[in-house]
């Protein structure tokens, strides 16, 4: 486990689970408890780093799930003001009737097509029903 409140180097966390803390009373893990917007976008400021989060999960259509995730990719930035940025982009969602697999099938297919045409990092990309192809794409892109 990695339980510090800072963005680690890859060598520090290889093979470990990184704990994100969304409970303000706890002082363990990367603190994401303040200002995490439910069903929206968040930017959580820390002294030395910033967490940027897209967590839109209440969707009007399966197409909206991919549209939101794709637009968020275009906002990802690397360090620009002396602070490290850690981006988390959720690729999951529900429709009026929870049909997670239907949303995931569409979003995952669109992500694979999109990623094959992009030369960019994706930050932390959270998927429902992930497959080996998506894993390889994200790992490869983030190591550029």
Provide a role label for each language-model segment.
Residues 1-144:
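Catalytic cores of phosphodiester-bond hydrolases, prominently lipid phosphodiesterases
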